[in-house]
């Protein structure tokens, strides 16, 4: 498949008047092969603590295999998504950048080497990660609480 549906729960937590930026708590819930499977998972999550208190914070995004800032060719997912991200802590918040979604670990590694040279990430060279997610397998199995 050339595309999958990425499901996240992105809850607003704070606004900084100093920087005029919003902070969110974002949970990656999984990658799904169809819009219907994504919607079915939302219904399951709505039964869990935390999620049912913030029912409007679910977001679906279509992601294509092997496309990023360096590659425009669409590949084929084969049961897994290899997710390339960059994360660093600025002293107050974790900052996460979604860099790409790949059909193979090797394709993700190739793009990672390109991103390492990007001035935006050069000060945090250890912040890169490549994680494998099985398509149609929920990644978050419990609810959550807020305080």
Q: Where in the sequence are the language-model features?
A:
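Short aromatic-glycine-(Arg/Gly/Cys) micro-motifs in beta-strand/loop hairpins
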Residues: 1-28, 70-98
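Short, mixed-charge low-complexity intrinsically disordered segments
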Residues: 26-27, 44-81, 114-147
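A short, hydrophobic secondary-structure junction motif
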Residues: 31-41, 136-139
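Short amphipathic alpha-helices within nucleic acid-binding modules
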Residues: 37-43, 106-113
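Conserved aromatic
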Residues: 32, 102-105
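Short regulatory "switch" loops immediately downstream of catalytic or recognition motifs
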Residues: 8-16, 44-48, 87, 113-118
């Amino acid at each position: 498949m050339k595309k999958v549906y990425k499901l996240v729960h992105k809850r607003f937590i704070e606004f900084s008047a100093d920087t005029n930026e919003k902070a969110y708590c974002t949970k990656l819930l999984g990658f799904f092969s169809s819009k219907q499977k994504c919607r079915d998972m939302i219904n399951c999550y709505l039964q869990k603590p935390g999620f049912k208190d913030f029912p409007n914070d679910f977001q679906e995004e279509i992601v294509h295999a092997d496309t990023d800032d360096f590659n425009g060719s669409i590949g084929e997912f084969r049961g897994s998504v290899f997710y390339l991200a960059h994360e660093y802590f600025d002293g107050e918040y974790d900052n996460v950048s979604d860099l790409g979604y790949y059909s193979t670990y090797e394709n993700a590694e190739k793009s990672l080497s390109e991103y390492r040279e990007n001035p935006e990430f050069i000060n945090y060279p250890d912040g890169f990660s490549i994680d494998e997610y099985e398509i149609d397998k929920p990644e978050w199995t419990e609810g959550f609480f807020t305080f």
